[in-house]
Amino acid sequence: MTVQLTTLIVETTAGEECPVEFLGDSADIVYFISMAHTERYGADHPLAKAAAVLKRQLRVNMAPLLNFADARVENEEEERLLERLWQDAAPVAAAARDVAQAIEGSPQLRELTADFPELPARLRELAEMAAWAAERGAKVRLTFVI
């Protein structure tokens, strides 16, 4: 039996392989951005609460991180959705960096994300990947597998 881990996939249009990679499990980012989507509906999960603090109290622009979808497609409509996910890399880099910095700098956010202690490190790695793409004028796409 093969066990597939939840993974964030970061693709670029750079035409070359990004030399930066995740140094640990990227599932924490997938869980965080997924819960950030549910925050507007009053989700009670600690990651959703962290997203609410980031968005509403600290005014961190998380929008570029919330532009993602399942990498597996089952029909043409989902394929079109994946194509619409390409976005400028610099805002993704800034958002990932800003969220990581906010988590590290806030006792409240550290407490809310305590079950995901590597989240800031993974976000910084994502920021490095996106910055690398931005330096090349490339776009990025965030997808995941579960």
State where each predicted segment sits.
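Acidic (Asp/Glu-rich) sequence patches and key acidic residues
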Residues: 1-146
